[in-house]
Every structure is written in C-alpha cells, then in structure tokens.
Amino acid sequence: MAAFSLDLLAQLPEAYQAFGPLIDILPIIPVFFLLLAFVWQASVGFR
C-alpha cells in the first residue's frame, strides 16, 4: 500500500502538468470578483 501511494504521488505532478497555466491564473480570480462588484455598483449608481 505504501509503495502504491508513493507511486501515485510521483505521478500526480506529471498528470497535472497540463493545468499549470490554469494554476497560475487562479489567484487572480478574487480580484475579478472585486472589479465585478465595483462595475455592478457603478452600473446602479452606487445606491
């Protein structure tokens, strides 16, 4: 069982290599929510 889990951990980085650019973008998503809130308030006139 231990050998299987070590083998699985060794394969995961290669399996997720294609998602590298997505992982780089993920931390920026909360900033987009902040900008969305500002644009929404601007569209309703900051009530």
Swiss-Prot record:
Keyword Transcription regulation assigned: no
GO CC terms: photosystem II reaction center; plasma membrane-derived thylakoid membrane
Database matches in InterPro entries: PSII_PsbK, PSII_PsbK_sf
Keyword terms of this UniProt record: Membrane, Photosynthesis, Photosystem II, Reaction center, Thylakoid, Transmembrane, Transmembrane helix
Main location as per UniProt: membrane
Record keyword Transmembrane present: yes
Propeptide: 1-10
Location(s) in or outside the cell: Cellular thylakoid membrane
Membrane topology designation: Single-pass membrane protein
Gene Ontology BP terms: photosynthesis
Top-level taxon in the UniProt lineage: Bacteria
Family according to the record: Belongs to the PsbK family.
Subunit (UniProt): PSII is composed of 1 copy each of membrane proteins PsbA, PsbB, PsbC, PsbD, PsbE, PsbF, PsbH, PsbI, PsbJ, PsbK, PsbL, PsbM, PsbT, PsbX, PsbY, PsbZ, Psb30/Ycf12, peripheral proteins PsbO, CyanoQ (PsbQ), PsbU, PsbV and a large number of cofactors. It forms dimeric complexes.
Chain's role: One of the components of the core complex of photosystem II (PSII). PSII is a light-driven water:plastoquinone oxidoreductase that uses light energy to abstract electrons from H(2)O, generating O(2) and a proton gradient subsequently used for ATP formation. It consists of a core antenna complex that captures photons, and an electron transfer chain that converts photonic excitation into a charge separation.
Protein name according to UniProt: Photosystem II reaction center protein K
Species whose genome carries this gene: Synechococcus sp. (strain WH7803)
Gene designation: psbK
